[in-house]
Amino acid sequence: TVLTNDPKQRPLFTIFNTVGSLLGMGAMQFFAPILAKNYEGGYASAGFFRTLAPVGIVISILLTLLAVIGIWEKDQPKYFGIGGEKTEKIKVSEYIQIIKNNDPMQRLMVAGAGCKLALSIATNTTVLCMLYGCMMGNYDGLYLPMMVLGYVFSVPFFLLTVRTSQKEGQKASLMKYVSVALVCYVGVLVLLLLWGRSDAFTLSIMGNNGLSINLYTILFIAFFGIGYGAYYATADMPIPMVADCSDYETYRSGKYIPGIMGTLFSLVDKLVSSLSATVVGIAVSFVGLQSLPTQYDPYTPGMNWVVIVLFCIIPMVAWAATLIAMKGYSLTGEKMKEIQAVNACRRDAVANGMKLEEAMTKWQSMDQLPAEYRS
């Protein structure tokens, strides 16, 4: 909220956040399979984690320092809400009532949880080990190529989501590209249901004699690539939308509470991330395994259904919940323009000596504002 309230700038956060994700999560995903080969037990070995964990810690520290540097200049009371330095502190007892009356924030928390759950489960290492290793029988030859293809497909979608957000609002962008992911994953689901009927119904990129790609693989790359690109580009989109919900609360009540909103959203985000590992563990137990499978474990009967549920069905249900929640989300592109204009007018009036209560009563919609705020 303090960095910018420009509807054309806020969506850019997803691009910068993705660069950070690629440096962090992307680096870990890239190095993990390479390091796992050097340790007996692969991903389950203590040596693997002793080597990989410091890499993640160093990357996290560097990215955190960049975040602190980025917000340092704007993290001042004069940029806080309508009242600036005069903004009153909110009591803890008021938080529940504020969230209860902020319907857009409630819906966004559902949407954010859905997007995060889909990404966390579908990209879980155990799920990918079962898919590319246990089912397809070639983890080393499929995981990295598919990961790279997924990132390649995501690039145009990041540009599209930002452009759509700038022109139509973040709600329209989120719903449009989550819908794309949902439709594409219907194709992925069908392909996984057909798996195992013959050698033609399995993923194959490279064989003993070179390139050995088949129609099944081409279709999988198309559906998975487009679907992954769409949902990876929208996975972090709810984060800048929290700022919209905070601005709405300032518009609605005059209170400035981005901290509590960000904390609540982050809490849901972390709970969902933790839940994803639990869901994977419970699902794996249904096929009789006592430990999480690695890329070297053989296929166990019923494992394909576990993969179908974790890799396709749960993400699809999560996306459906996101679309349902966002359907009633009131902060469209046009509404946010009005909110920003009204807040700006009130802020200037309070800075010039008007009481906050008077400013809140005097300006409540775009047509009530002076001409300079309506442009």
Show where each model-derived region lies.
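Intracellular loop-helix junctions on the cytosolic face of multi-pass helical membrane proteins
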Residues: T1-D140, P315-S375
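Loop-to-transmembrane helix entry/capping segments in MFS-fold secondary transporters
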Residues: P7-F16, Y139-G141, A243, E249-S266
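Loop-to-transmembrane helix entry
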Residues: L12-I15, R50-T51, Y132-V152, L215, ...
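Glycine-rich segments within core transmembrane alpha-helices of 12-TM secondary carriers
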Residues: L12-K37, M147-S154, L264-V284
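A membrane-interface helix-boundary motif in multi-pass transporters
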Residues: I15, I34-V58, K171-S173, G210, ...
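Helix-to-loop junctions at the C-terminal end of transmembrane segments
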Residues: V155-A172
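C-terminal ends and interior cores of transmembrane alpha-helices
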Residues: V180-N214
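Hydrophobic core of transmembrane alpha-helices in multi-pass small-molecule transporters
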Residues: T202-M237, M241
